[in-house]
């Protein structure tokens, strides 16, 4: 970074940002295999290769990364759960997720968030009902193929995290504590002196 900084003119601000952190990967957790063994996911006869194979009788299914959908009647193609039972089923699934332990002990899931607490905007209607965030060392997978076990080992020994992202702005007086990805685009426009309508951004410029 020092060499890059030396290449810049004195009136140029260097900004370096990442959208994720990094951690070790010990086990993959196959969410749909877990749900199937608990009787929460059922498939069409002799088929379990895709989301289309999820059949009546299913309570929920998972898509990566850590997204869980209640099989709600009227919303899902083969919906099973009635609207009046939705919240109870969602709370039950949340509790089950938080109790999962890895092969060597320790909790797999760090937290489980409800959709209305993390998503906003025009497309919130297609957001997952629950979002599970793993503890370090676990990668939440959601394939629909045949799995030997709920936990497995993959080819990688590292993975992204949702935390510990990097942000460096080489400009005196910049306050980046508590900032997030929403701040990046308006900050870049501000640094470049480009006029824009702040109302179209979810975040504010850090300048």
Predicted regions and their residues:
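Secreted, luminal/periplasmic, and some membrane-associated catalytic domains
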Residues: 2-143
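Cytosolic regulatory/linker segments at or just downstream of nucleotide-handling modules
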Residues: 200-207
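Glycine-centered flexibility motif
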Residues: 9, 39, 114, 157-158, ...
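Phosphate/pyrophosphate-binding loops and the adjoining catalytic core of nucleotide-dependent enzymes
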Residues: 188
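Low-complexity, glycine/alanine/valine/leucine- and proline-rich hydrophobic stretches
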Residues: 133-185, 193
